[in-house]
Design a protein with these regions (language model features):
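Bacterial N-terminal signal peptides that target proteins for export
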Residues: 1-7
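N-terminal, motif-rich segments that launch catalysis or mediate targeting to/interaction with membranes
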Residues: 20-179, 183, 194-310, 314-343
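Hydrophobic helical h-region of N-terminal Sec-dependent signal peptides
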Residues: 10-13
C-alpha cells in the first residue's frame, strides 16, 4: 500500500476487523464491500464462501509482493500503487490529457526531462535503487489494465461454459476470475486513499501555508493506526451503504474505463487538503469525541472504493465478449470422432 520506501504488514482478519485500515484489513474490507454489491447471477457461477474468502484475501496480494525486496519487482510493482497528480504539470499534462497507454506516459516524462532538465530536482542514486524516482505513478493504468484482464477472464469463461469446456477447464477459468477480481481490488482501494494521489503522501511537503503535519508517520496512521485506535472496521455496518453494482456507462469506449479511473482518482485527490485539515483540527487522534470525528471520513472512503470496485467487476462481466478463437477450438474439439485426443 505505501509508496516507495514505505512498507506494510499483512495479517489475517475477520468480518469485524480489529486492526488496520488500508493495510491488509482495509483492502480485505473493500473487497468484501464490493462483493456485497454484486447480483446473485454475477459471473455465471456461484461465488461460494470459499471464493469470496479468496477474493477478500487477495486484496492484500500486491503488498505481499514487497516481501522479497528484489529490485525488479519493486520497480514493476511500486508505481502501480499511486499517482502524484501534482507532477503532471511538469510534463505539460492534465488529468484530462493523460495518455491511455502507460508507456506513452513514460515517453512523455522522458522527453520533458531531456528537454527541460532544469524543471526537475536532481535524484540521489542512493535513494533510487529501484529506479522509480523519475516516475509519478501508474495507478489509473493499473486499474484499467486489471479491468481488461478481468474482461479477458470472463471472455474465456463464458466460452468454456457455452461451447463445451471440460469441468476442469471451467473450474480453472472461474478460479482465474476470482484471482484477478481480488488482486485488482487492491489498486481500486489505493485510489480511494487520498494520500495515494499526491506528492503529500506522507506529511505535507514544500510550502505549507495551513501548517499541516509534516510527520513521516501520517500515512501509516491513516492506513492503519487510526482504525486500530477506534475499534477496527465493521464491514457489516459499512455494507449497508453499498448499493447494487451498476454498469459503467462509458466503459464500451476505447478509453472509457481509463477516463473513469482517472476521474475517480481526481475526486479523491480533492480530499487531500480536507484530510490534512481533519488532522490539524484534532479529529484524527482517535481520542475523545472530537478525535473520533474523522472516522466518518475514512469509513466513507472505504465505501467509495467498494462501490467503485463492484461497478468495475460488474462492468467487466457485462462487457466481456465471447472468445472467438477459443470457440472455434472447442467446436473443432467437440466435433472430433470419439476416441480422438482432445487438446
Amino acid at each position: 500500500m505505501y509508496k516507495k520506501s514505505l512498507t506494510i504488514a499483512a495479517v489475517l482478519g475477520a468480518l469485524t476487523l480489529n486492526v488496520g485500515a488500508w493495510d491488509y484489513e482495509g483492502h480485505h474490507a473493500i473487497n468484501e464491500l464490493a462483493l456485497a454489491s454484486l447480483p446473485a447471477d454475477f459471473g455465471g457461477f456461484a461465488l461460494t464462501p470459499a471464493f469470496k474468502n479468496r477474493v477478500a484475501f487477495l486484496g492484500g496480494e500486491p503488498d505481499r509482493w514487497r516481501n522479497v525486496g528484489d529490485l525488479p519487482l519493486r520497480h514493476f510493482n511500486g508505481p502501480d500503487h499511486y499517482i502524484d497528480l501534482e507532477d503532471l504539470k511538469l510534463y505539460g499534462l492534465t488529468p484530462e490529457t493523460l495518455p491511455l497507454m502507460r508507456y506513452d506516459l513514460v515517453a512523455d516524462i522522458a522527453r520533458e526531462r531531456v528537454a527541460h532538465p532544469d524543471k526537475f530536482p536532481p535524484i540521489d542514486p542512493a535513494k533510487d535503487a529501484d529506479h522509480t524516482r523519475e516516475l509519478s505513478g501508474f495507478l489509473p493504468w493499473a486499474i484499467t489494465e486489471y479491468y481488461e484482464k478481468l474482461k479477458s477472464c470472463f471472455s474465456y469463461l463464458k466460452t468454456f461454459q457455452k461451447y463445451g469446456g471440460t469441468p476442469e477447464e471451467i473450474a480453472n477459468a472461474q478460479a482465474n476470475v476470482v484471482y484477478v477480481m481480488g488482486v485488482m481490488g487492491h489498486f481500486v482501494g489505493d485510489g480511494s486513499q487520498p494520500l495515494h494521489t499526491t506528492m503529500h503522501f506522507n506529511g505535507w511537503v514544500g510550502d505549507n501555508p495551513h501548517g499541516y503535519t509534516t510527520s513521516l508517520k501520517f500515512h501509516q496512521w491513516i492506513d492503519g493506526g487510526y482504525f486500530r485506535q477506534t475499534g477496527g472496521i465493521n464491514v457489516g455496518k459499512l455494507a449497508g451503504k453499498i448499493h447494487p453494482a451498476e454498469r459503467i456507462k462509458n466503459a464500451g469506449q476505447p478509453d472509457g474505463m481509463f477516463r473513469d479511473a482517472v476521474s475517480y482518482i481526481v475526486e479523491q485527490n480533492k480530499l487531500v487538503g480536507p484530510l490534512y485539515a481533519l488532522d490539524k483540527e484534532g479529529k484524527l487522534t482517535g481520542e475523545g469525541d472530537k478525535g473520533l470525528e474523522g472516522r466518518v471520513f475514512l469509513d466513507g472512503q472505504l465505501v467509495k472504493a467498494g462501490q467503485m470496485l463492484g461497478d468495475i467487476w460488474y462492468t467487466a462481466w457485462l462487457e466481456a465478449p465471447e472468445d472467438q478463437y477459443l470457440e472455434k477450438q472447442l467446436q473443432g474439439r467437440n466435433a472430433a470422432p470419439a476416441g480422438t485426443e482432445k487438446k
